A protein has these predicted regions:
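C-terminal helix-rich "cap/oligomerization" subdomain common to oxidoreductases
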Residues: 31, 116-117, 296-335
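A contiguous active-site-proximal alpha/beta segment in oxidoreductase catalytic domains
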Residues: 146-206
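N-terminal glycine-/serine-/threonine-rich beta1-alpha1-beta2 phosphate-ribose binding loop
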Residues: 4-5, 22, 28-136, 158, ...
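Bacterial N-terminal signal peptides
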Residues: 11-26
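Short helix/strand-capping hinge loops at secondary-structure junctions
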Residues: 137-139, 144-145
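N-terminal secretory signal peptides that target proteins for export/translocation
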Residues: 1-10
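C-terminal substrate-binding/catalytic lobe of Rossmann-fold NAD(P)-dependent oxidoreductases
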Residues: 240-289
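Rossmann-like dinucleotide-binding domain that binds NAD(P)(H)
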Residues: 194-261, 305-312
Length: 335
């Protein structure tokens, strides 16, 4: 809460100074002409194209007024093919199509913007890249995965806490319309538990669930809530099954396929019936709504402590898989 308070105080101070400088009646006009300036770190993911289009192009179906991407830091890493194979293409598109200024380093970026989207596809880069953002006291959204390990994720949490700056991380699948519908289902009585499915595509340089399995993990946490204590993971061919045991005894199941089937689904079991989701995600609109709301209010829609637990869940799953599916307590990762 102290992080949020500090951010809100800064924004109120800025607004009060601006109000003193602008005649009454001209404030709304000035605000309309001065959108919140957004900076992007890491141009090696398709998210930067979707987000820039939504914030800069009024004709976009997901357009959100009042924001503009004005600067970006290229980033990228030679350690991950998913990064180096795409970063030049996305950088050129952001610069040439959307006229976003490409800057040489993150401190320069922070000096030009009000808020930051940390988008680097390799979560292992996030800790070092977010440090100058916290030093500049800029609110930041950190795209999935939060980090490449629980250790790095915990350090991000501690740095944000020390800087008194708000941040959050989330997958777009947390805000899929089907996730929201089935979080509070109708007509099936009391909810017992959930099964979710999503791709578990692997990258050679990323732990098993960190690159793409994170989407299904985030869905499961959004639906089940916090409180998972142990995780087990088994793999057969291209199929992965992860079972989390919550402290109230519920079992949340995540199923994924590392190749072949690319789909997302949710099944919710209640005392009076079962409901299933549709299998087509509806883009980034829901996530972008949460991000821009966060940038305006400074209130994270996902508790950072829950985000730490999702990283611990994935790391514990990797340990379980390496141990032949034996259950691994999250405490083995977080201690």
């Amino acid at each position: 809460m102290r992080n949020v308070f500090s951010f809100v105080v800064r924004r109120l101070w800025q607004a009060s100074v601006l109000a003193m400088l602008i005649p009454i009646g001209g404030f709304a006009q000035a605000a309309a002409k001065k959108p919140i300036k957004v900076g992007i770190i890491g141009l090696d993911t398709s998210h930067v194209i979707a987000f820039t289009r939504a914030l800069n192009d009024p004709s976009s179906k997901n357009y959100i007024p009042g924001f503009r991407v004005v600067a970006a830091y290229k980033g990228g890493t030679p350690d991950a093919k998913i990064s180096w194979s795409r970063v030049d293409k996305f950088t050129a598109e952001v610069h040439d199509k959307w006229h976003v200024k490409i800057v040489k380093d993150i401190p320069t970026l922070c000096s030009m913007v009000d808020v930051v989207l940390l988008e680097s596809v390799d979560g292992r880069q996030h800790l070092e890249q977010v440090k100058p953002v916290f030093a500049a006291h800029k609110p930041v959204f950190i795209d999935k995965p939060l980090a490449g390990s629980y250790k790095d994720a915990k350090e991000i949490y501690e740095l944000g806490k020390a800087a008194h700056d708000p941040w959050f991380t989330a997958s777009s699948l947390r805000y899929w319309s089907q996730t929201e519908r089935l979080e509070h289902p109708e007509g099936i009585g009391r909810v017992l538990t959930y099964d979710v499915m999503g791709p578990t595509i692997r990258e050679p340089d990323e732990p098993s669930l960190f690159y793409y399995g994170v989407h299904a993990v985030e869905m499961l946490y959004q639906l089940m809530g916090p409180g998972c204590e142990t995780v087990s993971m088994q793999t057969s061919g291209n199929e992965d099954v992860v079972v989390g045991k919550w402290k109230d005894g519920r079992l949340g199941v995540m199923r994924g396929f590392s190749s072949g089937l690319y789909a997302f689904s949710i099944t919710v079991y209640g005392t009076k019936g079962v409901l299933h989701s549709k299998r087509v995600p509806d883009g980034y609109g829901g996530l972008l709504h949460q991000i821009t709301k966060f940038f305006k209010t400074g209130v994270p829609p996902v508790d950072p402590r829950e985000s730490l637990k999702t990283i611990a869940f994935m790391q514990a799953a990797s340990l379980s898989r390496a141990r032949g599916g034996a259950p691994v307590p999250l405490s083995a990762v977080t201690k």
